[in-house]
Structure formats: structure tokens, C-alpha cells
Amino acid sequence: MSANRLYLYDSTLRDGQQTQGVDFTVGDKIAIAHELDAIGIDYVEGGWPGANPTDDAFFAAAPALRRARLSAFGMTRRPGRRPEEDAGLMRILDSGAPVVCMVGKTWDFHVEIALRSTLAENLEMIADSIAFARGRVAEVMFDAEHFFDGYKANPDFALRCIEAALNAGARWAVLCDTNGGSLPHEVEAITREVAARFPGERLGIHCHDDTGNAVANSLAAVRSGIRQVQGTLNGLGERCGNANLVSLLPTLMLKMGYETGLSREDLRQLTHVSRVVDERLNRAHDRHAPYVGENAFAHKGGLHVSAVEKDARSYEHVHPEDVGNTRKILVSDQAGRSNVLSLLREVGLVIEANDPRVDRLVRLVKEREFIGYTYDGAEASFELLARQELEQLTPPFELVSYRVTDERRMTETGVPFTLAEATMKVRVDGEMHMTVAEGNGPVNALDRALRKALLTAYPALVDMHLVDYKVRILGSGAGTDALIRVMIESTDGSGRRWTTVGVSSNVIEASWQALSDAVAYKLHA
């Protein structure tokens, strides 16, 4: 084994499921396991057999993995029982997984208070369970629960637990910062002492993020000689989460030069994998996530953009393509000519740098942002505005008028509900269309009325739908007198997403602006 080789253990499907609001289906777990396998993760922890029906169903229909090894998680035997008499231990050994990861106590406080056992029996539980498992599965790991707290309290006992596991045949002994309270300098010092006594190529690290240091603690452990790193995709996990493998992977490979099971080509799938997990969970992707966030390589200030255009290294620590991400130039009231020119080129608008229309467009953007518009994140509205100013846009339709009414009604059983109705007149290719549509709210009614008017002329609208709608009150206006900004995110059958913006003191008018821009962008693109 190369001294520079690290082994990656993903526990998204078990630890990640302990995140508040996360509830994987069996299909979710199988799909995510295949994504992890495809990029070259060494171990995929599928769950805890016997803990819940989902995990049982997952192992019963375990996916065939090409590159990763499937691991089942569980506990060492209970006090006072032999391994073969412990139903929980037998469930993980009978799960069919080639690897099992057993958690056991290494903090004397936990042994005496939580287990109501003795330190001597705890050592026997670790050794008995691992030795028994070694005869039944290909590989056994030991998760040393609360190791860092245990080491601080009683280093001799904590180390004897690691020794018992390794001597019994564990391939890896994983040092766990279970409470997430250790700091990087503590982790580095303690793991260096452990690695001086036991081979680093048999030691792992498992960190929680309760102090915001899970990634830093994992890196500190690697610097001290540990060679297995555990974590989860997007930092999922109970309480504050686990070490984020999505941040760790590129740091270990691109910054620290370690070898992993991933090739550089595999690493280019990282952004995709991160977003697949959020899509599966119906969660918004963290725009500010290191490496893979939408804003990880976003540039807003004009001086920054000008420098990036000359050499991306001036404001980017790695190439976005190396992790499957893309550079993003933002337009805002801080933007200069560099931002605008870069964005115009990106959308295929060719214009000379000294063209006076560029200055006019910059001024227009700043004026509109002053009254509440934002094109930082609403690039579709910016492109429409730019094409209009450059006289390169023919509006696909013209609004003549709209009227929206909201009516509160009662069901036959006396339950109140509201129904919105929109009446709209639009002109398409010189021909007037008047439509009426109902919706569960005014924006939904407007959307339906507009589609109804346009579908005959523009059948491509059939696969477009809105996926997000945000309202924000702007400025110092008092309550209902304030300006309102609406952002709408849309998508279509191709998977493209785009965001548009509208601003008004009337929420329906602001919504109309964002909605009409969304439709116009779809028809133009």
C-alpha cells in the first residue's frame, strides 16, 4: 500500500439519515450508493441492519457495486452475552455485506454509566465481537466511539481498546470525535500519539461538526498519519453534521497531493454527486458550499472579474472544472464593464469593449439595482435586459392587461379555502388573445392564464414549470407600503434552470414581471 494512499469511507446512508428532516427511501439509498461507487469511494456504509425496515430492505436488495465495498454498521456484543447469542451482532453479520463496522465504547465514563459495565468486560466485548466476526465476513472495522473524549479522560484505557480491536483482527480502528467537541490541535496531537503506537495504515478518523471543525479535524488526523477518512456527502449527519466528504476530497487530492480511489476524471463528477443528493432529499443546494456551490467560483466586483479574465488564478484557488463546477460572473451595482462584457460573451452577445451601449447597460443595471432589482442570481432577467438594450430581442408576446381576483369560499363541510382567477389580454404576432384561468393563488392563476394564451403559438412551454418562488420586502417602507422583490426559478424538460426577478410595491405586479421574464427567456433560449 502506498504511504500516500488514503481510503475513503462514506456514511451518508447511515449517519446522514440521522439528519433532521432527512428520510431516505430504499430507492434513494440505492441510487446514492451507485453514485458513490461510480466516482471511486472505497467503502459505502449502507446502514444498520435490524435498526429499521428501510435498512433491512436495502440490504435485502443490496446494489452490486463495482469499485466500492458495501459495509454494514452495528454494535459489539452486549455485556453478559456471547457474540453468537447477540441478535444485533448476528443481524449485521448475516446482512450479506462483505464489510462490517462495529461501534464500541472507548471512554471509561460511557462504559461505566451508559453500559453499566466494567472496563475489563468492555475490552473483552471488543475483542470477542471482532474475532467472532472475522470468521464470517471479509473485513471488520472498529469504530472507537468517543475516542478523543476517552483519551483525554483515560488515555491508557482508550489505547487498550484500540489494541484489543487490532489484535482481534480489525482491519481498521477508527478514532471517532463523536461529540464533535475536539479542536484541530487536539486531534492532531492525539492522533500523532496513537499513530506512534499503532500503524497509521490501520487507523481511521470520524469527525462530527459541532464546533465547525469536522473537516479541519479530519485533515489534522491525516497529517498525523491516519489513512482512512470517514464522512458524508454535503456534511449530512445528526446535530451539526459529519465531516463533509465533498469538501475533504478535493482538498486531500488537489491541495495535499494524496492518492485516493478517485481519479482526476472522477473528481470532476463531484459537483454532480453533491447536487444529486440534495435533489433526492428535495433540499436546496448550498450556493456557498466550498468547491461545488453555485457561488464557489462566482465573481461580483469589477476588479476581480477583470483579473480573472486575464488569469483565473488571481481569484480562484483551483480550476472550477476540476470539481465539475463552472465559473460565474455576477452583475450587480458593484459590477463594472468587465463583468458586463464577460456575461455578454457568455450568452453569445458579441460587442466591442468600447461600444457606448456597454456603458449605458452598466448604468441601467446600477439604476435598477438602486430601486430594488438584483441581477446577482437572476441572470435570465439580465440577459433579456441586455438583449433589449442592444436591440437583439424581439418580445415573443405583449401584455395588454391583466386582472386578478381572490375569492374566499367555504366547502360544503364549512372549511374555508381561497380561489384566484386571472383574466389576461396578450398580443402574439399582432393577434389579440384573451384568456381566463383559475389557480390556487394569484401567481398560479397568472401563470395558467399566460400559458393558456401562448401554448398554441409556443407549444414548447408545455414542459416549463416554476420550481421556486421567493418574496422579499425591501427598503424602509412601513409594512404594506414597502417595495417587494420577487425571484422565480424555472426549469424545463431539458433540466435547465433559470431565475428571473421583478420589483414593485404590488406583489402581484412584481410576480408578473418575474413570471413574464421567465416565459420570455424560455421562448428565446
Give the predicted meaning of each segment.
Residues R69-G74:
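A glycine-rich helix N-cap at a beta->alpha junction
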Residues L6-L8, R14-V44, A57-L65, R78-E201, ...:
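Alpha/beta enzyme core
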Residues L175-T178, Q230-E238, M253-S263, D322-L330, ...:
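Short beta-alpha connecting loops at secondary-structure transitions
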Residues N440-L461:
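A short, contiguous, amphipathic alpha-helix enriched in charged residues
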Residues A457-D492:
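Generic long, charged, amphipathic alpha-helical segments
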Residues G495-A525:
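Mixed-charge, glycine-accented linear interaction segment located at domain edges/termini
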Residues N179-S182, A189-K310, S314:
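Catalytic alpha/beta core domains of metabolic enzymes, predominantly
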Residues R5-L6, T12, P250, M256-E431, ...:
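A mid-to-C-terminal "edge-of-domain" accessory segment
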